[in-house]
């Protein structure tokens, strides 16, 4: 179950680009260990979502252009799970906020209260 990066046969080995567990290794600006080679999206660690790749692309290109962008803050990018009903989230988990000593409010919403969750 899951997504496998499509990195076979695209020349990464010949260039010497570092790969770990089916993902291209990059820094916070999506530079690989090979100068001039960058990677974003589904082939780097992180959520495999189009809007995540878009944020990574903006950061990467701004860095290439010398614009000194802030690294992508993945906690500010919405995430989703395409189930029925759908599940979405944004921000840190409760555990992450606790570990960082950040004041937070946690909410719960029971599926039984959602008409979409109980309709067949």
Regions found by a protein language model. Name each.
Residues 6, 43-120:
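Mid-to-C-terminal Rossmann-like scaffold of FAD/NAD(P)H-dependent oxidoreductases
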Residues 1-68:
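FAD-site-proximal beta/loop scaffold in flavoenzymes
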